[in-house]
């Protein structure tokens, strides 16, 4: 049967389109990486609330409507990395508030160790929520360093959770990612274990300690 060039062109286009429609979803399914069960699990996407462990949650800035949920989760302490007063949304809820305003683009090792220690201390009293404004950059940084220093994850595993865990766009976590990539993991773990303020002997916190000791000498 004779077909015109236009008919052959239509058949070719139909074949290409069919292959695309059949192969596209299959290819996407093959290339989409499954979400690790070890990553923080979603609790309330409206405030980017995730459960990292039975005693540690992370989120964006909550609101007054979040209080009932946090009470059901038995959160005892809220740790904030922004300047806003958490009492504005917590009201009179029986939750301890810890304010630790930070900047992900200029955080240092001493600040990270201080936050990790305060998180651990608060966890001993019950579940803790840490948050910043959007729940990805500052919160992502401290969540990743908690995974690495406290829980023993390696950098790559913590970075994968940070960037692919559903907390926000990867571009919004550039500062956090940069700190994690450059972190002296062994030094931070050793300083954490030894109760030191920083892995660097020349850190400002150590200089302050030396000055205080010098002033205390008779």
Curated annotation (Swiss-Prot):
Q: Where do the Tyrosine-protein phosphatase domain residues begin and end?
A: 44-188
Q: Which organism is it from?
A: Pseudomonas aeruginosa (strain UCBPP-PA14)
Query: What is the protein named?
Result: Dual specificity protein phosphatase TpbA
| Family recorded in the similarity comment | Belongs to the protein-tyrosine phosphatase family.
Superkingdom as given in the UniProt entry: Bacteria
Where is it located? Periplasm
Assign the protein's first listed, main location to one coarse class.
periplasm
Q: Which residues form the signal peptide?
A: 1-28
Knockout phenotype, as recorded, reads:
Inactivation of the gene alters expression of diverse loci. Inactivation of the gene increases cellular c-di-GMP concentrations, increases biofilm formation, EPS production, attachment and pellicle formation, and causes cell aggregation. It also abolishes swarming, decreases swimming motility by 40%, and affects colony morphology, converting white smooth wild-type colonies to red, wrinkly colonies. Mutation reduces extracellular DNA (eDNA) and decreases cell lysis. The tpbA-tpbB double mutation restores eDNA to that of the wild-type level. Mutant forms flat and thick biofilms.
Q: Which residues form the active site?
A: 105 (proton donor/acceptor), 132 (phosphocysteine intermediate)
Broad class of enzyme this protein falls into: hydrolase
The catalytic activity, as recorded, is: O-phospho-L-tyrosyl-[protein] + H2O = L-tyrosyl-[protein] + phosphate; O-phospho-L-threonyl-[protein] + H2O = L-threonyl-[protein] + phosphate; O-phospho-L-seryl-[protein] + H2O = L-seryl-[protein] + phosphate
Coiled-coil stretches noted in the UniProt entry, renumbered to this chain: none
Q: How is its activity regulated?
A: The phosphatase activity is completely inhibited by trisodium orthovanadate, a tyrosine phosphatase specific inhibitor.
Instruction: Identify the keywords attached in UniProt to this record, alphabetized.
Output: Hydrolase, Periplasm, Protein phosphatase, Signal
- Function field: Phosphatase that regulates diverse phenotypes in P.aeruginosa via regulation of the concentration of cellular c-di-GMP. Acts by dephosphorylating the membrane-anchored diguanylate cyclase TpbB at tyrosine and serine/threonine sites, leading to inactivation of TpbB and reduced c-di-GMP production. The reduced cellular c-di-GMP concentration leads to reduced adhesin expression, reduced extracellular polysaccharide (EPS) production, pellicule production, cell aggregation and biofilm formation, and enhanced swimming and swarming. It affects colony morphology and controls rugose colony formation.
Subunit note: Monomer in solution.
């Amino acid at each position: 049967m004779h077909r015109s060039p236009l008919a052959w062109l239509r058949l070719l286009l139909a074949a290409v389109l069919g292959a695309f429609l059949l192969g596209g979803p299959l290819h996407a399914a093959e290339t989409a990486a499954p979400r690790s069960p070890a990553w923080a699990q979603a609790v309330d996407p409206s405030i980017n609330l995730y459960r990292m462990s039975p005693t540690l949650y992370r989120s964006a800035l909550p609101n007054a409507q979040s209080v009932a949920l946090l009470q059901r989760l038995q959160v005892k302490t809220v740790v904030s990395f922004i300047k806003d007063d958490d009492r504005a949304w917590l009201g009179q809820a029986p939750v301890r508030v810890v304010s630790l305003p930070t900047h992900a683009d200029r955080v240092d090792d001493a600040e990270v160790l201080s936050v990790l220690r305060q998180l651990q201390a608060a966890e001993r009293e019950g579940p803790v929520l840490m948050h910043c404004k959007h729940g990805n950059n500052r919160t992502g940084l401290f969540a990743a360093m908690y995974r690495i220093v406290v829980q023993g994850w390696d950098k790559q595993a913590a970075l994968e959770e940070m960037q692919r865990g559903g907390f926000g766009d990867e571009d919004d976590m550039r500062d956090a990612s940069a700190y994690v990539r450059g972190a002296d993991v062994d030094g931070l773990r050793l300083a954490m274990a030894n109760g030191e303020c920083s892995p660097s002997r020349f850190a400002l916190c150590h200089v302050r300690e030396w000055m205080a000791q010098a002033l205390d000498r008779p």
